[in-house]
Each structure stands twice: as C-alpha cells, then as structure tokens.
C-alpha cells in the first residue's frame, strides 16, 4: 500500500498540470474569439464630393446630402424616366448618389504600373478600389512598401457587373483579349490589390449583396484573430455605370420616386441607389498599440447570419435580425445597455424599415437605466451604396465614436406607423447629438442586411486613451526647429500635384496638426516613390508657401525640386579660404543643432588658448570677427563645426579639398591634423600675416590663366595667386598695383573686382614669412590622412609625393606662398566624384566649381552646393542643402 502512494501523487500532479494547460489553452481560445481589433486607417470616395474621411465627416456634421441628378455621362435620366414604376424599361427616379469628384476614366494607371490597355479593360470599380485602398494605408501611416511579403489580407465586397455588361454589348469577338476577364472578374478586385501591394495573406471577394462589405469586416476580424493575417484591408466598391440595374430595381418597386432615402419616416417610399468605395485598415489592438499606430476605434465583436426561410427570398426576417444582434453582443462580451448608438441598415423601404425597427426595439429594450438607444442611417446622406454600404456605415460609426458626436439623420419627420409601439422608445437622430456621457467608452453597432438574406452586425468601441499606450512608439525627441516635408511621386508632375494637395490640407483641415507631426508622417509613413521634392520650413506658413512653390515649379526658401537624371558617386567636401564670414553666422545652428553646438564646445578651450577669444561667444552674440587672427581662426572653427553637422546627418566626404587656408580645415577633417594642431597652424599663419595688414590685397578677374599671366607680366610684385576656374583667376599684390590692373581689365570691357582681404597671400610678399612659419611649426607631427586630400598647394596636387603631402611645417610654409591650384584640383576630383559640398558660412567657390566641371564633364551629372548663406536662416539653409544631397539617393533622409 505504501509503495503505491507516490504513484497516486504523480498521477494527481500530472492531472493538475494538464488542467492548467487546458485552462491556458481555453483562455487563449476565448481571447482569440473576442480579441479586439483596431481600426487604424480609412479611405473613401463618396457622393457629395467626398474624397477622404475628413470630408466625409464634414458632410455628415453639416447634414448635407450627396444625392444629385443622374450625370449625363452615365445615362439620359429623362429618356428612362417614368413616374409609373411598373412600365418596362423605365426608371421611376432621376436621382442618385453619384461621385462628383472622381470619374471612371480618371484612374492613374501609370502610378500603379498598369498599362493603359489593361487599365481600359479593368472594371472602374477595381480602379476606384485600388486608389482608395492606397489612401487608406496612407491614412493609417503604413508605407505601402512595408506590406510586401507580409501576412496582410484583403477582403472586398463587390456585387455589380455594369462595366462587363457594357463591354459585352459593345465588343466584337475579335476585340476580346486576356485583359477582359482579369479586369472584370470580381475575384481580381482583391487579387489585384494584393498583387500591387505584395500582400501574402488571404485575398477574398465577398458577394452577399448589400451586406458584402460588412461581412468582409467580420471575416477579416476572424482572420486577424486566428493569426491568419497580421493586418487587413477591408472594403467595398460600387459604381452605377449602366441604367440596367436601376431599371430592374424600379420595376421591383424598391426605388424612391422622390429620389430620397427617408429612412424610418412615415413617408418612406424606397431607397436611392448610390456609388462609391471605402476601405478600412484593421489590425489586432495589441499589435497596433505596440507599433504606435493611431487608433480610430476598436471592433469589439461581430456576427453574420442568414434570414433562412422568411416569407420571401428578398424579404427581411425579423427573428433572424434579432438573433444576429444578440450574437454580436455576445461576441463582444457586452450587453444591450452598453451600446449607445446603432448605425442601421435603414434603406427607407416601407417593408424593411419597420422590421428593422422592431428588431432593434426588442433586442435593446433592456437598457438598465441607460439613455435611449440612438439610431440613424448614412443612406439618408449618400443613398444605398450596395456592396460598399456596410463599410460606409462602419466609417460613419467610427467617426462618430472617435469624435463623440452623432451626426444628423436626414429626411426624418415622423416615425413610420408600420413599426410596433416599442420602436417609439428608440431615438432617431433627427438632429446632431453630442455623445451621451456614460463614464464608459463610447460604443456603437453597425448593421448591414443583404437582399439575399445574409446579414452582418459589427460592434465598435471608442479607442483606448492614447496615454495608456505611451512609450510604445519610438521617442522622436524634441520638436525640430526646422521640419522637412518630403513629397513623393513617380514623376515630377505627380510630386507637384501632391504638393498642391498637401498645401491645401495644411491651410485647411490640417491646420491644427503640428508641422513636426506632418513631417514625421510624410517621411516615415508614406510609400517612397522614384521622385520626390522637399520643403524645409520653420513654421506652417512657410511650409504652405514652399509647397505651393514646389507645386508651381518655382523657387522659394527651403524648396528643393525633384531632380531629373542621376548623380554619380563620390562626395568631396570643399573648404574655402577667407571671405565667407558674417555677423550672426551659426547663431541659429548653435541653438537648433546639437552636433554643431557640441563641436563648438569641444573647440572652445583651444580658441581661448590659441586666439584669446571665445568663438562660442562670438557666434551666440552675432558679433563680427575682427582682425586677421580672429577671422582666420573663426572660419576654421565654423568649418570644423559645420563638418560635424553634415556628418551627424550621415553625409561624409570621400575626399577633401582646401582652398588656400581652407586646406588647414581639410587636413583636420582628413585626420592629418588634430583640431588643436589645425588651430595652431591657423593662429601662427594669421599672427605672422598680421603686420602686413593693409599692404596687400587680391582681385578676381574674368580671365583665364594665360591672359592673366600676360596682364601681370610687367608687374613683378603681382602674382597669379589663385587658379579659380578655366575662365577665372585671382591676382595678389600691393593695393595700388591691384587697383591699376583692375582698371586695365575694365577698360577692355572685362570683369574685375577687389577681394575683401587686406594682405596678399600666395605672393612673393610671403617669402619673408616662410622661415618663421617653418620655425614655429617645427615640432608639428601630422599623421597620414584617413581621407584623401587633393592638395591645391602643389602643381601636381601632391600626387608626386607618393602617399601625399605630409602637412608638416614645410607644407604650411609652402601653402601660404604657392598659388592655389583650385581649378586643377576640382578637375582632377571630378573624374571620380560627383557631389561637391562647400563647407563655409557663405558659398564662395560653387561658381568656380561649376565652371571647372562644365569645362570637362557633363555638369548635369554633378551636384554643387554650399552649406550656409549670408544673412539667411542658418538652420533652414543647412537643411535645404542637406535635402538637396538626399535627392542623390533612392530615398531621402529619415530624419525629420
């Protein structure tokens, strides 16, 4: 007996483990059957000029109707009209819910890489669906390229075949090709969308007539809960392209002769057919919170059933509707008292309305102290969108729950007398209603009943408090001083069109959205196309001005237009000499850009030691640099800090070139000198030159080297100091002689002007300074550069020196005396490098760079830009130039 005891304990222990395992599995199963689903994005085209959810909400809140006379492009309303619906071949109404802002032939086939021939064969319902689905993803902040290869599903409601019927009557047998079936078979509505996006989840088309798109929502939620999908695009599409279906509906007695859906009203006499498309983007709530998605509402549960054997195949079944509503509440783990509003099917037929009212009154009779159930129907605004009706109702409910307002239900004056007395306890939203305060999340139900008997009901709930999910999205840091808006398009005209739309949105519906948030969405949550332009702006007004300029193909501060053609590889940082300084340079960067501020702070001790002044104080105070020493030290300090700024945004040099004293900064950036050594070289050079201040100057001439040599042949004290470009040179020498030569050139109708400098470097005047330069820098210990330096100090650019110049004392003595061979250095670099960025407080060399490249290469294959601009907004100017470099790549910088 004793020996058997451990066996019993083992059995009991094993049994308990199995119970725990089964309990855990049951909990998982229960969760998967009722897991909340987030609505994270929506797109639509509806009657009333509605192109997006914001415009849809505006229409609803304004109590507007989208019903219009049948457009002449569809059919001749008068030719088919007859007030007697029993007359064959006629229609008892001339009205409909037609799209006024989109036409079937407006599809942008090229954008979706669809050939014109294939697009022409496609049912316009498919064309419309593709565009709206794309916009829904944009609304969700899901870049379309991120869907490729993922378990993203597509569930679409489609019922009409107007286009195929039209083609069948028009095309001859010889006109039929492979595009006709693929363009008109309903299954391709989902399959083609999945193909365009590269989605790998289920792609299913549902046809349950009027309930198609809400049944699609139910199936999508099941797919998400079952882990068959990780995200779902769900919608419906419907276009009225032929009078045939309207003739049939009229004979059936379903259409309103007045052309209005008077849902639940005593005068209801039928519905108005409508067209449109809508798509919602769904995701498991936990995943949406984890990924930082904006959540518009949450699907708590849903149900689908069938009328079964009612009094007729098209007659609604009250008990079936009641069972559906009860099942949806059970699926949501809610009671009738938890629901505040129901977006009803509500077609406005004398038969269907009373049955639906009675079903609602019976299921929601037990309100347990809650306010009256409010009901309404979007069909009074849009008409009956048939396959798209369910998702249109869902969108209205989502917007109502999200905004805490129930829009007005149109065309209602007196409750239909055909409903039971209990229906009078329902509150029809004859006026707009602020959502009742209940102390719990706002909740709504959405019904959609198919004419063939398949019914759907979805229960939605207000999204959770965003603060509850704080920290789930990666922190974006402080709001940037300048925001960059990236505007994509497959072609430059499409970029312009998008910029125009975005400008209108920023000036209107998006006026309250922070500019930094707009930039973040555009830069991180939009599909990246082959062309893009950028607008950098410090505020909304400047952003709108920039976007309108981009749309018009005009220049404006902060605007970088799409670039045509390609740029080769290789980036050169070019460091100018004197002349780029100005009071206030870098002050805005010091406040806005941490990398720039950190570089200035790192250099500060050396400035105090070498120059006896604080560069930070000069920059922060917007002061002038005074005297040779301050100017030269201040410029190299700016150049090193600007280099750090470029590098902080991922732009780094493959080679460096220094112009005159700019070669010191180039040597530091290349690693040949430390910053302290670079400042020392600059301080020694400027200190030695200071006594010569006022004894020399320079002049820029629009002459090539040969003409300049001839010009100065009789002036031994004047030298050709700089080979600027193939057609420009700079001479150096005593002021009186330089002025005399300037006059000579001008007398020959040539261009000549003084350079703002008070000494004459690269001139025999420097000979006397060279020994002291060698002596004071004798202990300088440079290192081999880690980045190639193309030296402007030597006739052969330093190439004959094996591994290049040593950048020791001898080099810097030679640098101050020899002519600057800038033209030759740029021409040499142009063979392997295609981007030239001048690192300075104001561009002095970009013109010479362009001239030099143009003489030897196709200049359109090169980019030449500066960094800052005199008296301009530092941060804005830098980001504009940064954005210009981003056009070299297939995608822009991911920084905002």
Summary of predicted features, one role per range:
Residues 352-357, 844-854:
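Short Gly/Thr/Asp-enriched flexible loops that form oxyanion-binding sites at enzyme active sites
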Residues 301-302, 306-311, 598, 618-839, ...:
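Acyltransferase
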Residues 2-477, 504, 526, 623, ...:
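Condensing-enzyme catalytic core of the thiolase-fold
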Residues 39-40, 574-575, 836-838:
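Short hydrophobic beta-strand that contains or immediately precedes a catalytic carboxylate
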Residues 187-190, 564-657, 661, 731, ...:
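Helix-rich "cap/lid" substructures immediately adjacent to catalytic or cofactor-binding pockets
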Residues 2-13, 33-36, 335-338, 380, ...:
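Acyltransferase loading domain of fatty acid and polyketide assembly lines
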Residues 133, 576-579, 889-894:
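Conserved adenylation A10 loop of the ANL superfamily
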Residues 863-884:
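Short, flexible loop segments at boundaries between secondary-structure elements
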């Amino acid at each position: 007996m004793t020996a058997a005891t451990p066996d019993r304990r083992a059995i009991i222990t094993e049994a308990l483990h199995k119970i725990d395992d089964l309990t855990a599995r049951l909990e998982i199963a229960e969760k998967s059957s009722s897991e909340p689903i987030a609505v994270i994005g929506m797109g639509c085209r509806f009657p009333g000029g509605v192109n997006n959810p914001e415009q849809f909400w505006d229409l609803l809140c304004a109590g507007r109707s989208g019903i219009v006379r049948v457009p002449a492009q569809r059919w001749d309303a008068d030719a088919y009209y007859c007030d007697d619906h029993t007359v064959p071949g006629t229609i008892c109404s001339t009205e409909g819910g037609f799209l006024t802002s989109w036409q079937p032939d407006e599809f942008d086939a090229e954008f979706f890489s669809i050939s014109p021939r294939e697009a022409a064969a496609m049912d316009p319902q498919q064309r419309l669906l593709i565009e709206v689905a794309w916009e829904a993803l944009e609304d969700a902040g899901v870049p379309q390229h991120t869907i490729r290869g993922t378990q993203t599903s597509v569930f679409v409601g489609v019922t009409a075949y107007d286009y195929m019927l039209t083609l069948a009557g028009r095309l001859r047998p010889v006109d039929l090709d492979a595009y006709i079936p693929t363009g008109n078979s309903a299954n391709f509505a989902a399959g083609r969308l999945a193909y365009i996006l590269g989605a790998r989840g289920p792609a299913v088309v549902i046809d349950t007539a009027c309930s198609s798109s809400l049944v699609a929502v139910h199936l999508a939620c099941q797919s998400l809960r079952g882990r068959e999908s990780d995200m779902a695009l769900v919608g419906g599409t419907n276009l009225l392209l032929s009078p045939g279906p309207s003739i049939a509906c009229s004979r059936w007695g379903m259409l309103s002769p007045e052309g209005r859906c008077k849902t639940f009203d005593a005068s209801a006499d039928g519905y108005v057919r409508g067209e449109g498309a809508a798509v919602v983007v769904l995701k498991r709530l936990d995943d949406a919170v984890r990924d930082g998605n904006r959540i518009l509402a949450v699907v708590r549960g849903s149900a689908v059933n069938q009328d079964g054997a009612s009094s007729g195949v098209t007659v609604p079944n009250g008990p079936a509707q009641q069972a559906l509503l009860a099942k949806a509440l059970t699926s949501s783990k809610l009671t009738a008292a938890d629901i505040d509003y129901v977006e009803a099917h509500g077609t406005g037929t004398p038969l269907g309305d009373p049955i639906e009212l009675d079903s609602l009154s019976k299921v929601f009779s037990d309100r347990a102290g809650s306010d009256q159930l409010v009901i309404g129907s979007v069909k009074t605004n849009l008409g009956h969108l048939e396959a798209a009706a369910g998702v249109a109702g869902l969108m209205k409910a989502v917007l109502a729950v999200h905004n805490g307002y129930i829009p007005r239900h149109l065309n209602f004056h007196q409750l239909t007398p055909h409903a039971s007395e209990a229906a009078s306890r329902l509150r029809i939203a004859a006026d707009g209603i602020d959502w009742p305060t209940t102390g719990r999340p706002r909740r709504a139900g959405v019904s959609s009943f198919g004419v063939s008997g398949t019914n759907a009901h979805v229960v939605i709930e207000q999204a959770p408090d965003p603060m509850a999910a704080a920290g789930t999205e990666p922190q974006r840091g402080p709001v940037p001083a300048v925001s960059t808006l990236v505007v994509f398009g497959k072609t430059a005209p499409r970029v312009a069109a998008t910029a125009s739309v975005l400008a209108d949105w920023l000036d209107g519906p998006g006026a309250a959205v922070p500019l930094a948030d707009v930039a973040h969405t555009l830069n991180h949550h939009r599909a990246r196309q082959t062309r893009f332009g950028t607008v950098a702006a410090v505020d909304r007004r400047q952003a709108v001005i920039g976007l309108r300029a981009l749309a018009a193909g005009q220049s404006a501060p902060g605007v970088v237009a799409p670039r045509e053609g390609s740029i080769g590889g290789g980036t050169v940082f070019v460091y100018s000499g004197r002349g780029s300084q100005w009071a206030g340079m870098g002050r805005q960067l010091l406040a806005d850009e941490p990398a720039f501020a950190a570089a200035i702070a790192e250099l500060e001790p050396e400035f105090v030691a070498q120059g006896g002044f604080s560069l930070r104080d000069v920059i922060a105070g917007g002061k002038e640099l005074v005297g040779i020493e301050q100017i030269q030290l201040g410029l190299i300090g700016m150049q090193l800090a600007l280099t750090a700024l470029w590098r902080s945004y991922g732009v780094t040099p493959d080679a460096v070139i220094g112009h005159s004293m700019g070669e010191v900064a180039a040597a530091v950036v290349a690693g040949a000198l430390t910053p302290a050594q670079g400042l020392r070289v600059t301080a020694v050079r400027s200190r030695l030159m200071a006594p010569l201040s006022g004894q020399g100057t320079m002049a820029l001439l629009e002459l090539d080297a040969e003409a300049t040599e001839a010009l100065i042949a009789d002036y031994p004290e004047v030298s050709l100091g700089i080979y600027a470009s193939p057609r420009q040179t700079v001479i150096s020498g005593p002021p009186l002689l330089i002025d005399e030569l300037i006059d000579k050139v001008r007398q020959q109708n040539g261009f000549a002007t003084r350079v703002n400098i008070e000494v004459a470097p690269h001139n025999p005047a420097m000979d006397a300074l060279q020994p002291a330069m060698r002596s004071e820098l004798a202990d300088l210990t440079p290192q081999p550069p880690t980045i190639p330096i193309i030296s402007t100090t030597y006739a052969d650019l330093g190439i004959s020196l094996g591994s290049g110049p040593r950048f020791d004392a001898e080099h810097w003595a030679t640098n101050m005396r020899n002519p600057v061979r800038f033209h030759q250095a740029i021409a040499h670099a142009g063979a392997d490098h295609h981007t030239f960025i001048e690192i300075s407080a104001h561009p002095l060399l970009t013109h010479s760079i362009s001239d030099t490249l143009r003489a030897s290469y196709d200049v359109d294959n090169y980019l030449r830009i500066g960094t800052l601009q005199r008296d301009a907004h530092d941060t804005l100017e830098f980001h504009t130039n940064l954005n210009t470099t981003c056009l070299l790549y297939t995608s822009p910088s991911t920084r905002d």
